[in-house]
Design a protein with these regions (language model features):
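Short beta-strand-centered aromatic/proline hotspots
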Residues: 22-39
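A short, compositionally biased
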Residues: 9-11, 44-48
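Mixed-charge, Lys/Arg-rich low-complexity intrinsically disordered regions
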Residues: 1-14
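Short amphipathic beta-strand/extended segments with alternating polar/hydrophobic composition
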Residues: 2, 27-31, 60-66
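Short polar/acidic secondary-structure junctions
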Residues: 8, 20-22
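Short, surface-exposed linear segments at secondary-structure transitions and domain or protein termini
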Residues: 37-41, 69-72
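Intrinsically disordered, low-complexity, charged/polar segments
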Residues: 46-72
Length: 72
């Protein structure tokens, strides 16, 4: 199932990303920035973006939440 809104994304969610070759990998949601919402430190992002982390500690930034699939 794909996300319909950035508001549905929760910290710690396990998501599946598919790369250009069709290979799917699991990631954890580390940070979810929503356009126009200010966080606790006063940062307000200009675009939606989600920062993911994989099993090896590599971080990946996703700008289009519809690319991620929810692991149920």
């Amino acid at each position: 199932m794909k996300y319909n809104s950035p508001y549905e994304i929760g910290l710690g969610d396990v998501v599946i990303l598919t790369d250009d070759t069709g290979y799917k990998t699991d990631h954890l949601v580390l940070i979810n920035y929503i356009k126009g919402e200010t966080d606790a430190k006063g940062y307000t992002p200009k675009t939606n973006r989600t920062i993911l982390i994989d099993n090896y500690g590599k971080r990946t930034t996703v700008h289009d939440y519809s690319q991620m699939e929810v692991v149920a």
